[in-house]
């Protein structure tokens, strides 16, 4: 036993050192930063009585792979050799890469499996099996069997691993040299190490505020943030630039600012350099400091990242995650906060930065106590373009922002110093829901029969009030894209000869048009999937957009057919729609016709797919949020040069196939995960596609009907909607709400209360706030309230009229 444990301990130590030294910290590296590891090895050469090993049947064997002993698995052992161990809180926020390898000698190809079971709170949260047949060479010949997979942090902490060989086929075989590894890792940071500047000695107060003060060094030309008693809160602020100029990447950081204006409540600083000039305007108002930053470039540049770097002197953060959840301890190393924020706690007060007015995103490097306020960031707006070329599947990466000479990028945000409080955060979904499910259908290869089947339940049903199944029956709205017309007389025959007629378009099928109007009148979002199957003409594009505006008034658009060819729908967002020199330039026509919420295929199409390594167990959410918050995945995207549009994306196409697939991929446990992570899941699908395998329909008794699996899944979603957990909604409704909350002014008052002002021209319906403490509205304004699914927070929701101001009170 002692020799066995020595071998285990030695290997664990060696592997731990190896992986600790093998970490990385580059912004865009996809390697995983391993913090520690566990390694267990057994070769069965000694009697090993450690309780973590299970069902060891040790025998001497002259054909052992190594040494003289092996572990025997016999037909009477349903549960053969295995290992049990616990994972406690000491792993922090780390994930784990699990790998197992063993040598196997079998008389035949095995049906047995190695099972990994993880339990938490006396409940099995993961059961996964791996075939022992992998690697088989020949009978009675040793072969290596191995596998590995990543396990997210939300499954690891305080969990129990129960791993074993499941010999349910009653087979005989031997194993030797079994090795089990858990290598802990954090997500890649997507933040480069920035320089920290020492605090200069010659500081003077250039603000003299009763709340937040600004300290300036004349010698070093550096600026810092302090409280009303001049206690320093930050190290010197700096600007970080990552630019592409004439094909070369330039990175620089500068903390020197010239003080150009200094008066009570208003300060102007200038940071000049060869490439740009950055003006920092700072205005104090009560307990708030408003930062306005403008960087003007002296030559054409592509911006990869432009950030104001704020290094703090302590790390007692309250972090308002993008989910939205709150972390106030047990932090991750790095957070991508999207448009959320954080508070820094000290003494009896806190410094707040939440719901910024106009920033691209916020990243918080907790490990280095540094905030990156991104004026612009490549990953906030991934965008590809299929240029017109004599090839296929070739795209250029247009994610970096192109800024012309003498043009500028502007940003603004507010920081406040207040009493300790629990800030109410703005929910990404209205009416008090914790999460949302958005169905977006692409119009390809459809027939009126398959439309009626998947929306009304059967091909025979013509009126929505008679629906027996499908989306309309369960009142699950869809953003449904359509073709306007069919000038090329495209038929469905090539996809399915059972549907030889024209594919569905508005102008070629009056019954289809009537079907769409019924959906429109019941809350469905009907938009263009481009005007036609192939590249359209400018006249047809104008006609289609005008018709859709008049009849459906959808602000949405879903690209179709994108690729490099001349027929590949050049009017697409990811083709020529944003190229003002192209005859297929579409941006101005979108604006004229109220189209502003566009599908961005880049997250599906770019190779390698961003963050593809962080998929887990066929969960709908990709990347899986349980791995952590460092990945820069924004809820929505905006483009600097095209301010009138907002982009949304999908991670993949949802094609469950047979009915069993529906009950697997959209099982209750996977839908529950969407709520648990307060996630907005947007799916790309083809319900009426004329091929039964890909479509959401099947044939019963000679009739086309909605698949049973689809109906079961929609019923589960409908029940979760009725429980006020998961809201089925359209792109139009979701994006409108996102636009409205972007225009919602959020100010934290000195006593910790919050003032909201609706700067929209329309009422925000069902504006939802969440907090760990109960909230109320001043002046006895009515509101709704419920507790979250986990019973740990409160959600309130209410309507807010244009220009209305509301005071939110928190019961601290």
Short names for language-model regions:
Residues 250-251, 258-259, 321-346, 350-352, ...:
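Active-site-adjacent pocket scaffolds in enzyme catalytic domains
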Residues 429, 635, 653-761:
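C-terminal domain-boundary segment and adjacent tail
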Residues 416-518, 522-525, 530-534, 540-546, ...:
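Active-site beta->alpha N-cap acidic-glycine motif
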Residues 123, 194-275, 456-463, 474:
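Acidic-aromatic substrate-binding/catalytic surfaces of carbohydrate-active enzymes
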Residues 24-202:
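Extracellular and organelle-lumenal recognition/adhesion modules and their flexible linkers in secreted
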Residues 323-358, 376-390, 741-812:
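C-terminal beta-sandwich/jelly-roll accessory domains of carbohydrate-active enzymes
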Residues 265-320, 545-554:
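Acidic, contiguous internal or C-terminal segments within carbohydrate-active enzymes
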Residues 30-31, 189-200, 290-361:
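Polysaccharide-binding surfaces and accessory modules of carbohydrate-active proteins
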């Amino acid at each position: 036993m002692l020799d066995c444990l020595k071998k285990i301990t030695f290997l664990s130590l060696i592997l731990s050192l190896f992986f600790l030294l093998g970490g990385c910290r580059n912004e865009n590296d996809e390697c995983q930063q391993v913090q520690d590891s566990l390694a267990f090895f057994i070769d069965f050469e000694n009697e090993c009585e450690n309780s973590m090993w299970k069902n060891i049947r040790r025998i001497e064997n002259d054909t052992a792979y190594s040494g003289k002993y092996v572990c025997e698995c016999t037909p009477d052992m349903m549960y053969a050799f295995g290992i049990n161990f616990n994972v406690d809180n000491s792993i922090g926020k780390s994930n784990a890469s699990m790998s197992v390898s063993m040598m196997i000698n079998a008389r035949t190809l095995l049906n047995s499996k190695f099972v990994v079971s993880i339990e938490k709170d006396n409940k099995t949260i993961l059961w996964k099996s791996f075939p022992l047949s992998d690697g088989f060479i020949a009978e009675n010949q040793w072969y290596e069997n191995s596998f590995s997979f990543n396990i997210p942090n939300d499954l690891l902490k305080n969990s129990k691993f129960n791993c074993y060989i499941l010999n349910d086929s009653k087979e005989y075989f031997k194993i030797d040299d079994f090795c089990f590894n858990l290598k802990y890792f954090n997500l890649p940071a997507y933040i480069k190490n920035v320089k920290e500047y020492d605090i200069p000695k010659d500081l003077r107060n250039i603000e003299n505020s009763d709340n937040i003060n600004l300290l300036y060094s004349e010698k070093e030309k550096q600026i810092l943030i302090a409280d009303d008693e001049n206690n320093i809160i930050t190290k010197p602020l700096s600007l970080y630039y990552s630019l592409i100029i004439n094909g070369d990447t330039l990175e620089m950081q500068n903390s020197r600012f010239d003080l150009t204006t200094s008066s009570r409540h208003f300060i102007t600083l200038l940071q000049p350099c060869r490439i740009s000039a950055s003006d920092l305007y700072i205005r104090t108002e009560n307990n708030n400091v408003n930062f306005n930053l403008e960087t003007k470039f002296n030559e054409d540049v592509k911006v990869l990242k432009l950030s104001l770097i704020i290094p703090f002197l302590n790390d007692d953060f309250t972090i308002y995650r993008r989910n939205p959840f709150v972390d106030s301890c047990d932090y991750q190393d790095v957070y991508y906060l999207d448009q959320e924020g954080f508070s820094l706690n000290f003494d009896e007060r806190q410094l707040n930065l939440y719901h910024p007015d106009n920033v691209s995103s916020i990243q918080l490097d907790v490990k280095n106590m540094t905030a990156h306020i991104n004026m612009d960031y490549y990953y906030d707006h991934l965008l590809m373009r299929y240029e017109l070329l004599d090839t296929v599947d070739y795209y250029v990466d247009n994610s970096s922002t192109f800024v012309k000479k003498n043009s500028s990028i502007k940003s603004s945000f507010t920081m406040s110093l207040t009493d300790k409080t629990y800030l109410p955060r703005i929910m990404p979904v209205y009416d008090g829901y914790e999460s949302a499910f958005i169905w977006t259908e692409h119009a390809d290869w459809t027939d009126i029969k398959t439309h009626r089947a998947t929306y009304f339940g059967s091909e025979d049903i013509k009126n929505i009030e008679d629906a027996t199944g499908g989306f309309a029956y369960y009142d699950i709205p869809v953003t449904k894209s359509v073709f306007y017309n069919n000038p090329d007389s495209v038929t469905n025959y090539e996809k399915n000869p059972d549907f030889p007629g024209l594919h569905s378009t508005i102008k070629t099928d009056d019954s289809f048009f009537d079907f769409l109007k019924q959906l429109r009148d019941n809350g469905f979002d009907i938009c263009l999937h481009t005007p036609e199957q192939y590249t359209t003409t400018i006249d047809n594009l104008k006609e289609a957009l005008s018709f859709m505006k008049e009849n459906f008034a959808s602000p949405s658009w879903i690209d179709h057919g994108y690729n490099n060819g001349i027929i590949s729908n050049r009017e697409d967002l990811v083709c020529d729609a944003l190229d003002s020199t192209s005859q297929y330039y579409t941006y101005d026509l979108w604006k004229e016709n109220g189209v502003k919420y566009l599908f961005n295929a880049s997250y599906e199409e770019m190779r390698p797919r961003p963050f593809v390594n962080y998929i887990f167990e066929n969960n709908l959410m990709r990347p899986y949020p349980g791995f952590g918050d460092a990945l820069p995945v924004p809820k929505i995207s905006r483009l600097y040069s095209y301010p009138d549009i907002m982009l949304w994306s999908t991670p993949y196409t949802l094609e469950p196939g047979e009915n069993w697939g529906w009950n697997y991929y959209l099982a209750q446990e996977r839908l529950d995960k969407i709520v648990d992570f307060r996630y907005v899941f947007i799916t790309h699908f083809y319900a009426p596609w004329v091929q039964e395998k890909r479509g959401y329909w099947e044939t019963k008794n000679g009739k086309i009907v909605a698949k049973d699996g689809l109906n079961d899944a929609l019923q589960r979603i409908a029940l979760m909607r009725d429980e006020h957990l998961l809201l089925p909604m359209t792109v139009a409704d979701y994006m409108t709400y996102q636009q409205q909350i972007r225009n919602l002014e959020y100010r934290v008052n000195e006593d910790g209360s919050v003032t909201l002002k609706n700067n929209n021209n329309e009422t925000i319906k069902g504006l939802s706030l969440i907090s760990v403490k109960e909230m109320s509205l001043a002046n006895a304004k009515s509101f709704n309230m419920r507790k979250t699914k986990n019973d740990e927070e409160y959600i309130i929701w209410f309507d807010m009229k244009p220009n209305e101001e509301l005071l939110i009170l928190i019961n601290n």
